[in-house]
Design a protein with these regions (language model features):
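Structured catalytic cores of large enzymes
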Residues: 1-207
Length: 207
């Protein structure tokens, strides 16, 4: 094994994607306790290593694939609202009521709609609204119920909405604006989740 040699292998993220057959989309699931996975390499000098076997190429393909599913999400675990439990939330909307998040899908299949799901949280004494845009085009508005300040009620309210978007560019910028007439209101982004289709073309350099 020389100094310029390296090992390539298939690794799995602690964050996983699950297929939802009811809508044909993938939903992400963030690992509650880890952001990385560790692999341990064992070298046995007493035995020959494994080898990749040569396989014959298949003839007369019955199906031609020209695109594939691509998914991406933005979720940061910045704040635990009640300092207890497993629910953490990301960017805060109070002093900064508008924030943008950039996604990139090289060779995006523009004939297939992009599915964008946004989940948000708000703590407001009156109903409040999030406005979600993609590349400056309005996607949807998400209404969030007001909280009730009596004992044993929710500290904040959660809402979610999914919308299809016909993207004309591989770059998708999601902008979220928050509005409430309660001057003491606070809000948070839970996550943005995107399902898209990409053309089966190589992007980047060869290994």
């Amino acid at each position: 094994f020389e100094s310029a040699d390296y090992i390539l292998f298939y690794g799995e993220s602690p964050h996983i994607w699950n297929y939802d057959a009811s809508n044909g989309l993938f939903n992400h699931q963030t690992h509650l306790f880890a952001d990385e996975v560790n692999y341990f390499l064992t070298i046995d000098n007493q035995q020959d290593g494994k080898r990749v076997e040569t396989k014959q190429a298949l003839q007369n393909a019955t199906k031609i694939v020209t695109s594939f599913n691509e998914f991406s999400f933005h979720e940061t675990e910045n704040e635990n609202l009640i300092h207890s439990g497993k629910e953490w939330f990301g960017e805060r909307f109070d002093t900064q009521n508008s924030q943008s998040f950039d996604f990139n899908f090289p060779n995006l299949d523009q004939l297939s709609p992009v599915s964008i799901k946004t989940t948000v949280v708000a703590r407001s004494l009156v109903p409040s609204v999030f406005t979600v845009s993609a590349n400056s085009s309005l996607l949807n508005t998400i209404s969030v119920d007001n909280i009730v300040t009596t004992y044993a009620t929710e500290y904040a309210k959660t809402a979610s909405k999914m919308t299809n978007y016909n993207a004309s560019s591989s770059n998708v910028t999601i902008t979220i604006d928050y509005s409430s007439s309660d001057n003491g209101a606070s809000a948070w982004l839970d996550y943005i989740e995107i399902n898209a289709r990409r053309a089966l073309k190589m992007s980047g350099s060869a290994m």
